[in-house]
Amino acid sequence: MRGPLSAWLVKHGLVHRSLGFDYQGIETLQIKPEDWHSIAVILYVYGYNYLRSQCAYDVAPGGLLASIYHLTRIEYGILDQPEEVCIKVFAPRKNPRIPSVFWVWKSADFQERESYDMLGISYDNHPRLKRILMPESWIGWPLRKDYIAPNFYEIQDAH
């Protein structure tokens, strides 16, 4: 089932895949990494002026990595429930690269850095893409399903 935003994107020739609606009735769309930056700018101009959250997850061991964006359209003076959309961008595990939306929504800064730190997704054109939670010397991506955690003594000896 296609939602209003998906219908608008189709009308304007913007490539995406509708994933239906989540349990709260929020429209969910899949965007290809190569199309994400231009569609992000279009969504901002369309009125999605607030990045509520960005997160990432490992779809399956050895599979794709996903970067999720929850966008809200806040209109001043409108007290009703704001319009929301969930965007999913999937990247290959081997070289996961997704355009950063830092220059569209500044709130993506720490959120994209955390996704990089935990899953190794590289956000192209991010101004400060470096580890934010783990030490710079940390090897690997702790939230990947195929990550092998070092035992306690290895961590203790490293410091």
From Swiss-Prot:
Top-level EC class as recorded in UniProt: translocase
Highest taxon listed in the record's lineage: Eukaryota
GO cellular component: chloroplast thylakoid membrane
HAMAP family (UniProt xref): NDH1_NuoC (MF_01357)
Summary of the function given for this chain in its UniProt record: NDH shuttles electrons from NAD(P)H:plastoquinone, via FMN and iron-sulfur (Fe-S) centers, to quinones in the photosynthetic chain and possibly in a chloroplast respiratory chain. The immediate electron acceptor for the enzyme in this species is believed to be plastoquinone. Couples the redox reaction to proton translocation, and thus conserves the redox energy in a proton gradient.
Reaction(s) catalysed by this chain's protein: a plastoquinone + NADH + (n+1) H(+)(in) = a plastoquinol + NAD(+) + n H(+)(out); a plastoquinone + NADPH + (n+1) H(+)(in) = a plastoquinol + NADP(+) + n H(+)(out)
Signal as UniProt keyword: no
Entries under SUPFAM superfamilies matching the protein: Nqo5-like (SSF143243)
The protein's name: NAD(P)H-quinone oxidoreductase subunit J, chloroplastic
E.C. designation(s): 7.1.1.-
Membrane topology: Peripheral membrane protein
Location (main, coarse): plastid
Intrachain S-S bonds: none
Family note: Belongs to the complex I 30 kDa subunit family.
Assembly mode: NDH is composed of at least 16 different subunits, 5 of which are encoded in the nucleus.
Leader sequence segment: none
Sorted UniProt keywords: Chloroplast, Membrane, NAD, NADP, Plastid, Plastoquinone, Quinone, Thylakoid, Translocase, Transport
GO biological process: photosynthesis, light reaction
A single GO molecular function term of this UniProt record: NADH dehydrogenase (ubiquinone) activity
